[in-house]
């Protein structure tokens, strides 16, 4: 097999360098910011912090597409309900796994909010705040992504789609 790698930067790969502008530094992973609408907590926080001076460009109805060698293509819609329907259309026999995946995402997201809240508490409160706020998240954080995804479905293509965007997070799902 041959693989073509298209890379314009002098250092190939992601997470290999940072940008610096006007005293600020960030890694290349921040090329898109999601959930910045007025209907989401991150969007409301950023709107408040910037006093409404930032205008966010939409990533579009589908912010990503994946193409497979056998002509299978899947789009990643911006809205979770549309993504669920996209997955159900592509994998009609996997409704249980798809619903379990979305339920898991909701639960992990909710537990991470509590986890981060526990991280901003004074250190002397950690024994209490960790047990009250961080416990569920810690359970998720101690699991390998690949193990969790494999527990949802044996369909390898669906497993790949569930973890397709691992590159955004800088670590392999295993």
Feature-to-residue mapping (PLM):
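N-terminal glycine-rich phosphate/pyrophosphate-binding loop and immediately adjacent elements
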Residues: 1-110
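Rossmann-like flavin
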Residues: 69-174
């Amino acid at each position: 097999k041959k693989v073509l790698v298209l890379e314009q930067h002098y250092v190939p790969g992601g997470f290999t360098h940072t940008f610096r502008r006007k005293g600020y530094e960030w890694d290349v992973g921040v090329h898109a910011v999601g959930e910045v609408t007025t209907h989401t907590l991150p969007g409301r926080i950023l709107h408040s912090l910037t006093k409404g001076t930032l205008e966010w460009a939409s990533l579009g109805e589908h912010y990503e597409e994946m193409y497979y060698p056998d002509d299978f293509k899947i789009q990643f819609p911006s809205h979770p309900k549309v993504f669920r329907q996209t997955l159900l259309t592509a994998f009609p026999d996997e409704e249980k796994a798809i619903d379990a995946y979305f339920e898991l995402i909701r639960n992990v997201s909710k537990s991470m909010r509590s986890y981060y809240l526990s991280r901003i508490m004074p250190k002397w409160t950690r024994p209490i705040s960790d047990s009250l706020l961080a416990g569920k998240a810690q359970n998720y954080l101690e699991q390998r992504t690949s193990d969790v995804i494999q527990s949802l479905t044996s369909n390898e293509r669906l497993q790949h789609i569930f973890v397709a965007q691992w590159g955004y997070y800088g670590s392999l799902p295993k």
